[in-house]
Curated annotation (Swiss-Prot):
Function according to Swiss-Prot or TrEMBL: DNA-dependent RNA polymerase catalyzes the transcription of DNA into RNA using the four ribonucleoside triphosphates as substrates.
Name of the protein in its database record: DNA-directed RNA polymerase subunit beta'
GO molecular function, one term: DNA-directed RNA polymerase activity
Cofactor dependency: Mg(2+); Zn(2+)
Organism the protein comes from: Actinobacillus pleuropneumoniae serotype 3 (strain JL03)
Amino acid sequence: MKDLVKFLKAQSKSNDDFDVIKIGLASPDKIRSWSFGEVKKPETINYRTFKPERDGLFCARIFGPVKDYECLCGKYKRLKHRGVICEKCGVEVTQTKVRRDRMGHIELACPVAHIWFLKSLPSRIGLILDMPLRDIERVLYFESYVVTEPGMTDLEKNQLLTEEQFLDAEERWGDEFEAKMGAEGIQALLRDMDLEHQCEMMREELQETNSETKRKKITKRLKLLEAFQQSGNKPEWMVMTVLPVLPPDLRPLVPLDGGRFATSDLNDLYRRVINRNNRLKRLLDLVAPDIIVRNEKRMLQKSVDALLDNGRRGRAITGSNKRPLKSLADMIKGKQGRFRQNLLGKRVDYSGRSVITVGPYLHLHQCGLPKKMALELFRPFIYSKLESRGIASTIKAAKKMVEREEPIVWDILAEVIREHPILLNRAPTLHRLGIQAFEPILIEGKAIQLHPLVCAAFNADFDGDQMAVHVPLTLEAQLEARALMMSTNNVLSPASGDPIIVPSQDVVLGLYYMTREKVNAKGEGMYFLDPREAEKAYRTGQAELHARVKVRITEHVKNEAGELVAETKLLDTTIGRAILWMIAPKGMPFKVFNQTLGKKAISKLINESYRRLGLKESVILADQIMYTGFAYAARSGASVGIDDMVIPAQKHEIIRAAEAEVAEIQEQFNSGLVTAGERYNKVIDIWAAANERVAKAMMENLSTEEVINREGNPEKQASFNSIFMMADSGARGSAAQIRQLAGMRGLMARPDGSIIETPITANFREGLNVLQYFISTHGARKGLADTALKTANSGYLTRRLVDVAQDLVITEDDCGTHEGIVMTPLIEGGDVKEALRDRVLGRVVAEDVLKPGTEEVLIPRNTLIDEKWCDVIDAESVDVIKVRSVVTCNTDFGVCAKCYGRDLARGHLINQGEAVGVIAAQSIGEPGTQLTMRTFHIGGAASAAAKESSIQVKNAGTIKLTNAKFVTNKEGKIVLTSRNTELTVIDTFGRTKENYKVPYGAVLSKNDGAEVAVGEVVANWDPHTMPVISEVSGRIQFSDIVDGLTVTRQTDELTGLSSIVVQDVGERATAGKDLRPALRLVDAQGNDILIPGTDVAAQYFLPGKAIVTLDDGAEIEVGEALARIPQESVGTKDITGGLPRVADLFEARKPKEPAILAEISGIVSFGKETKGKRRLVITPAEGEAFEEMIPKWRQLNVFEGEMVQRGDVISDGAETPHDILRLRGVHAVTDYIVNEVQEVYRLQGVKINDKHIEVIVRQMLRKAVITNAYDSEFLEGEQVEVSRVKIANRKRAEEGKPLVEFERELLGITKASLATESFISAASFQETTRVLTEAAVAGKRDELRGLKENVIVGRLIPAGTGFAYHQARAKKRSQPEQAVAFEAPVAKANGFATDADIEAEFEFVADDATQSLAALLNAGDEE
């Protein structure tokens, strides 16, 4: 028995000691070396005896015995014959398990090209031979000959010959040359490749060539050839002569009842190959006619293709049921493939699932577990306890007792469960809070009870949701569950750092009701000794809950030394608030409780508690708040009745007025005064305004009521209307929903997003008529359809994000960089979108922050900014801070803790080993389902914002203009002549309060540096037309303005004024094509006037559609408009919103009509125009001018002679992130992506920290393109990981060589995932075949750095608790002699069973996981 145990141990010790996985091409010899014998027959098993046929696909001699330790003929049975090979049937006596890993092989009668290297684009064989895929296919499938050895003839190598040409050549030259057909020909060509010589030639060619396309092509080919050279793969191995056969247990054949068999598709495919191969061998032996042999070879090629990748070429081979057979490639790719189905996600034992119900009496760390479930889940633990106590003699007896559910079993179950945490998971697990640990409480019934406060994290409700339970078995797993996953340790959300354990719904309503005050309630004005007395008064009915009273409150406040000091004061409060104060922990101020508590206030309260008192107190407080909230929600008796929906009296009046206005607009339309579009927009604006007015009247009506106070005078107070209370507290519902209940439903949208102009004037209390109901079905159904689509899309986005960021882990404490990104408050228009304190909270300062206006250091470099520092920033009114960021972090693999900053879910500097990439991906993906799917049309209600025509400031302060060029008109007002001018209002402390974009041609009433008062209008402009502003005074002279040729005259019927409209180039007659209509300004003598400060003449070219109202020779003053260009195109552009917008940003997609940016700084001019385009020329102060062709229909933001800076917008449109990166750098593109993504989430009210988006941006920027390689290992134009270039450059700097020059490249997340260094990770993501093909040809090595790779090979991940294990491994690798010491104590660590124990209990087998975890624990000890 002893040696059996040793033998078993040896068997289980798998080859786990590798650090790299290399993939390559298998040579024929390699395949033979794996093989245990050749499969010669297509037979599988004998259908009578069910024994495998000899030499067949399931042959026991090749693949091993069918029964454990028993040969096929039955001569040798039992363990004692282990290792004997039976002389009769030739089967080795061993475990059946070997049938899972012993391979066979098939000797192919002729070579066959591997379809992956042929058809997976770009074709590797094609690339290496430099032949088109078409040609190679014609050779392979026997349509043409290829010349393999031209000899002395005038044929060329690799030349294709048709049958006729081949015969002609043979007649002409005899056997001077060699030409072959089929895979043999291709193999011969590949074998003759001289890689070194080819590489040298390519390098020379690369030096000489100038054409960009040729360069790219050569680089591609060169990379492939070099990969072949370095990896030791030989090109001819891409053509197979030996085919490996998968072990039989991986392609099983199972007899069903009724004499039929269920089989894996692979067996059919292998059978086909063997049949054809054998037939071909026979034909070759018989020396059959060429055409027959060829046909057979072609069929063999096709059957091998189908085996490897069915359906890749031609039609897929189908089985008996018309379904394509599942080939080897299909086994590994896709959601059901090996990677995603079995390696990345496995099903686990010790789990159960059930419906969830509420457990309002539980503590936060508890959950209710049905007894039945617990008994089943903790079975083994119960068995072992029963046995060790001597209650049951054997495991079998224990099993019986448990099945009979004897009373003692329940006692033992309770003991086992004590302090054994379990994991609860609700699908879909969108972020890490979707799995949390709880301590089980045994309950009757069959539903799991869940604590109400963790519902937000799980996104659970109790309308039938189910949850899964998992039991952590090993000590280590229990430890992790308790220390890291316990619900009490996850109070803050990792996405935003705000509390996620926040009361909602009933609890909020209860607390809100409890803390409201009421005028003249019973007991008003009483005095109480302490909150206990106030409660007594309430319980005995002496005072109402809402009564305003004075209570003596004892607060415990921290003093300077940090000790709690008691302070007692008599304070104004209400009974309810005093009662609530009784649950407050010491150290919280009373003012936090002494207010009406809505949802936001409660969230703040818990946050405050967490920051002041720490985790434990906050969790206790949260629980107490919940119990109190439920109790008082029940007492409040708040409910919804139809009379609570009070319809405002003014409603009918408002609607009547709106209808009258609409009728008036319709009149105007009928008489032709307004266009159809204008009428539609105006009607929608009227109804939107009416809706607002009704809503306002309704809310005023609902939210306040008039009561008589103690003095007998009327006084307004907030109403106790149930519906209003629910919305006001944030418990349920919103003003928008109440508006539909008691106001009017308003405008509805069609499914395409356009707004129906007849609104629904009724509300739900009045009820809708048929027409109104019909209109509203549109929106409702669209909502449902959207939701279904949204879930799938959001899940896919999350998957892509996780994939791109999965290997980003905190690997060191400080990378030492001085770089960072500059943070300022986000201000749009007159309101601060996000204050500076919120943006820098939890970040590390990159360089000293100085006190504004002095040289004194306020915050030193490398300080982590916490709440206290934020107060300092506010007090000193700092408005710009440079903070460290993940994007600028210098760590090679991973990120450093200082560049990341605070761990949002814990509130301190992040620990090493934290998987920040995955957290970022989850934080961005999880709210994805809340984002909308639709694209917004600016139309009607939405366009109110777009049509601004003036700026009215909200704060007093000083005006500051940036990027401003202007002229002063005769009234002394300033007229802007620059494009992207920004107007900022700065307060007395120098803080930016407001920020506006001002368009070209706006008239400003204040200059730079002027003071403004609140509500002053500082700028106005015409929103519908863009003027052309004259920068000088003079006389107008028309140039190229010819009636009927370049312009048309229009006379306005109403006013009788005539104007000239410039025609578009496309609409002009041929004679007018080259004319360029312009207005020139001349002085009295007719000479050109120069624009001040330049030597450019003042002439203004007019684009198509421009309207000129002045006549030739008219006098004009400076700052007046020469012409106007109508801006009608603005109203129709779609704004992509919601989820698709986020996906577009992360995929770095180029928009349809991207903004055109200036590539260099210089002066703009226009060159010769072509048919549909105009030529833009930018001439810099020195160096080459830059030319670009721009389509005519693009509206340009620049006139001729204007000066632009590199990266300025020349033509409006959506900016392309690639352009921003190229022209403005990494910081600008980070800013752009972060702000754009945040914009979408902010609209939905979702809070995500910028850090997470930056993490993804870092991953999108991890590749660079080499622009100057010097003599390094890189090629120019090659795409390389930035970290690799940096490492190489550090080395080169030490050697004093010039540094390799590179440009950062922005990749979309899908591209970036596929371009990762690790081929295992890329293959398990998408396009498995392509990734594996590429990796195999290049002989890639996977260093197993990321998380996915390690999960796939079954290791601990190099993050979290596995981080130490991997560091220990790395240490061990560098000092091999200590390896023994590291391995030795493994067995003792967990007190694993000794040999004797195993003999007694033969059923127990230790698995690898427990061993590796034990090793992990030791790794920690050793360090």
